[in-house]
Amino acid sequence: MHAIIPAGGVGSRLWPLSRRTEPKFLLDLSGGGRSMVRATVDRLAPVSDGAVIVTGAAHAAAVAAQVEGTGVEVVAEPSPRDSMEAIGLAAAILHERLGDVVVGSFAADHVITDEAAFHRAVRAAEAIARAGYVTTIGIAPTEPSSAFGYIEQGDALGAPLAGRVVVRFEEKPDAARAAEYLTTGRYLWNAGMFVMRSGVLLDALAELHPELHRGLLAIAGAWDTRGRADVLAAVWPTLERMVIDRAVAEPIAARGGVAVVPADMGWSDIGDFDALAALAPSPPALAVAAEGSWVHATRPVMVVGIPGAVVVETPDAILVTTREHAQEVKAVVDRLDGPLERLR
């Protein structure tokens, strides 16, 4: 399997730690001594034959510096698009070079604590992908979260394939519906991990989104030539923005062509400060007198009588919220304009 690592997005729910100039995949949020993108590369090394990171031009140099010496290729997008363009471009480049190979897409900014379980899931997904399925790895839910999309799993594929047919993908539900999903035992969290043959993906794009397919093939055909820059500049801005779930996974699932490997591997997307607080306790030197609070600061901070408080200090900004309202941080950051826009 050849790994594709999309490294994009600002991670605004983790503001002021994550910014446009230094998004969360460049940060060491888990306290492991490595950036999230480097940890992702290292995690994939035992189960991949190399990796391609797709990131924005503004962050390409920083990403390259963090993965120096790993042999990983960094592909720079000239302007922001979405997951389908990033994954499709890397898959098309690999297909142009190597033919019909298995590719797997794994986000640059997730944390997985049980890497052995992750490796088992990836190997199972690779075997299913070789049989022609678009394969995803679904996370066994630990709570009725409304922060994630869900995957409804159906019948088992049957030996030797260790997975199940995907019935459908569900958008983020409200809390009540998420609780209903958990009672059925049929639903998994959608972590956005996809494993498939490059030919299967490109054939799906040719059928479902022919203009995107033509554009990606044109760029891939010129990628290893002197004409790369010209073709990229001419074609990339014309590509319609799409997410891979809606572009490929959902319509292929409707015809029974998507499979899922259920996994319990200590996964977190660290999507907000509630998730970060669950993963990385506050530094012990800080005095916190409210249950479940989380503090990131250079000075001692005392929190009294505010359960689940979140206090984050950086040199130029301070955030005060609660874990309950952690998902709402992005909406406030999006309103920063005028002289405050530089803080985004």
PLM segments and residue spans:
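Short coil/turn connectors at secondary-structure junctions
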Residues: 1, 48-49, 70-71, 98-101, ...
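Conserved N-terminal catalytic core of the sugar/cofactor nucleotidyltransferase
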Residues: 1-5, 13-17, 25, 30-117, ...
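Fold-independent oxyanion-binding glycine-rich loops
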Residues: 7-9, 56-57, 78, 106-108, ...
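Conserved beta-strand scaffold positions in the cores of enzyme catalytic domains, especially
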Residues: 26, 74, 134-136, 257-260
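Residue-level signal for inorganic ion chemistry
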Residues: 37, 90, 109, 151, ...
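A short acidic, often aromatic-flanked loop/helix-cap motif at beta-alpha or helix-coil junctions
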Residues: 80-85, 143-145, 175-177, 267-268
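Conserved core of the sugar-phosphate nucleotidyltransferase
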Residues: 115-236, 256, 322-323
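Left-handed beta-helix
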Residues: 198-344
